[in-house]
Design a protein with these regions (language model features):
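DEDD superfamily 3′-5′ metal-dependent exonuclease/proofreading module
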Residues: 1-217
Length: 217
């Protein structure tokens, strides 16, 4: 993570999960014998906040969920602040997102380690923009019924609860290498969309701000 985000620039998160997990890792590092523990602890402290001692890092992550709750509302979310509700609502409303993500990845300069270059994130069915989370492929796509009978109960991996369950199964359940690989690939696709969802929401906010600024001028 430290290498991926570099030394400058704004870091976004959505809600508390990332901040909570990083603070848990900080506690683990404090009790560890890792050679670079101090460097990693300093990095974590620079991008997180803590309630117990009111610490807030100089490069603290910006919570897009708080931005949404304080400055934006879309009735399509039906009152939910979840990223799973905000993303499809933003896609339905934003012309920029519709024009950009209706194109294959190869045409919009978006790289992916888990989807093909021809993959299109925005799909329309019966004139309705589809929820990208619901368009994620089934975990065990193209498996036979006989093979499926031997597997765990996870069929779709498109929400945080299913992702945590799948990760737990991989850690503590005796399963075939084939099933473990299928769950691993599904988790990677889900996590990639979770990350891209924050990019899309930020792009949607930016579009709204540009329109409002132009109207003021």
């Amino acid at each position: 993570l430290k290498l991926a985000i570099g030394e400058s620039g704004t870091i976004f998160r959505y809600s508390n999960h990332e901040n909570t997990v990083l603070n848990q890792i900080r506690v683990q590092l404090l009790e560890s014998d890792e050679v670079d523990k101090q460097e990693l602890i300093h990095f974590i402290e620079s991008i997180t906040k803590r309630k117990d001692d009111e610490h807030e890092g100089e490069r603290c992550m910006v919570d897009l969920c708080e931005v949404y709750k304080n400055y934006y509302f879309d009735p399509h979310t039906k009152g939910s602040n979840s990223i799973k509700a905000v993303l499809p609502a933003m896609l339905r409303r934003s012309m920029h997102l519709q024009e950009k993500y209706a194109q294959p990845l190869s045409d919009i300069n978006v790289t992916s380690k888990n989807f093909s270059k021809s993959h299109t994130w925005l799909q329309v069915l019966n004139d309705e923009v589809q929820d990208p989370y619901k368009m994620l492929p089934p975990v065990f796509d193209q498996w036979t019924n006989e093979e499926l009978d031997q597997l765990s109960d996870i069929e779709d991996l498109n929400n945080g609860g299913a992702a945590l369950t799948a990760y737990g199964f991989m850690q503590y359940t005796d399963m075939s290498d084939q099933e473990r690989e299928a769950l691993s690939q599904a988790l990677k696709k889900y996590c990639e969309l979770d990350t891209l969802a924050m990019v899309m929401i930020w792009e949607g906010f930016r579009e709204v701000c540009v329109v409002k600024l132009n109207n003021i001028r």
